[in-house]
């Protein structure tokens, strides 16, 4: 799994992680956040590598489906992009400080 995919899955997990089963959360944590191999995760959980892959694939599919329907991450990234553009357009220091505070909170 490449870095870009892990970053995207981490973002999806942050938004939709609570919709996953405990097992799916655990496998996302091990595979994506801790960068363990399917074999390592399987050994830790006493399941096969194939079971790890299957559970991860189902978790990813579930999160992608939710994002496709709800578009929460897409909207969040849109707001962040608009604030960043607004920051570039303004010369008002007070406004820039407020925008930076908002961006930090996001």
Name the predicted role of every residue range.
Residues 55-58:
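Residues within the DNA-recognition helix of helix-turn-helix
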Residues 22-34:
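Short amphipathic alpha helix immediately N-terminal
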Residues 28, 41-42, 52:
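Hydrophobic positions on the alpha-helical face of helix-turn-helix-like DNA-binding modules
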Residues 4-16:
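Short, Lys/Arg-enriched N-terminal segment that forms or immediately precedes the first helix
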Residues 60-67:
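C-terminal flanking helix
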Residues 80-106:
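Helix-turn-helix/homeodomain-like alpha-helical modules used for DNA recognition
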């Amino acid at each position: 799994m490449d870095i870009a995919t892990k970053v995207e899955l981490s973002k999806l997990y942050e938004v939709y992680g609570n919709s996953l089963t405990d097992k799916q959360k655990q496998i996302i944590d091990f595979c994506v956040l801790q960068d363990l191999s399917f074999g390592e995760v399987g050994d830790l959980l006493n399941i096969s590598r194939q079971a790890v892959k299957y559970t991860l694939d189902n978790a990813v599919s579930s999160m992608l489906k939710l994002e496709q329907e709800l578009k929460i991450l897409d909207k969040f990234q849109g707001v962040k992009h608009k604030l960043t553009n607004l920051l570039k357009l303004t010369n008002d220091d007070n406004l820039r400080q407020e925008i930076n505070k908002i961006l930090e909170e996001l």
